[in-house]
Amino acid sequence: MPSVNFRPMLACSESAHNFFDKLMLPLLASAKLDGIRATVRDGVVYARSNKPIPNKYVQSLFANYEYVDGELIVGESTAHDVYRQTTSHVMSHDKEDFPVRLFAFDHVKNLNDPYNLRLANLEHCLSGEHVVLHNQKYIETMNQLIEFEKLCLECGYEGVI
């Protein structure tokens, strides 16, 4: 049983433009990735459903990144078929030695801590070629958010989260 009572949230399917009046500035934003959500607890890499990721290679690569929450991506993060490629590899039991990375964006051991402290904990525990800190952009105005969303879309990401 996982030691942390944690269930990842899903991104909203509607555009941020529909929620402008509800957003509280400043905020942190990042490019929305289209991979498989993953959280490491008790040495096991779990999917958003709180079921273990079935791939043995993924489990061996990321089991030591306790409390790291992120998105598994196979290949280029902006490839048109990134979700299909990621699912095909990550959900297969026996595929090995494929170009998978964990784009880490939170450290969920102490969820009541402010995000800046969780981010510091995350930065402290990351190392290796397969783990990448997923950058957050500090946004102070709605115009900055709109421009950041445009940039993310132009680069091939799904949008902003």
Where are the model-predicted features located?
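Covalent nucleotidyltransferase
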Residues: H17-H130
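Phosphate/adenylate-binding "loop-and-lid" substructures adjacent to NTP/NAD/dNTP-binding pockets
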Residues: M1-F19
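Short, motif-level signal for alpha-helix interfacial/capping segments enriched in acidic residues
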Residues: A11-H17, V82-R84, I139-I146
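Amphipathic alpha-helical
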Residues: M1, Q136-I161
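Generic recognition of cysteine residues
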Residues: C12, C125, C152-C155
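A generic structural motif
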Residues: E71, H134-K137
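Short aromatic/hydrophobic-glycine micro-motifs
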Residues: H130-V131, Y157
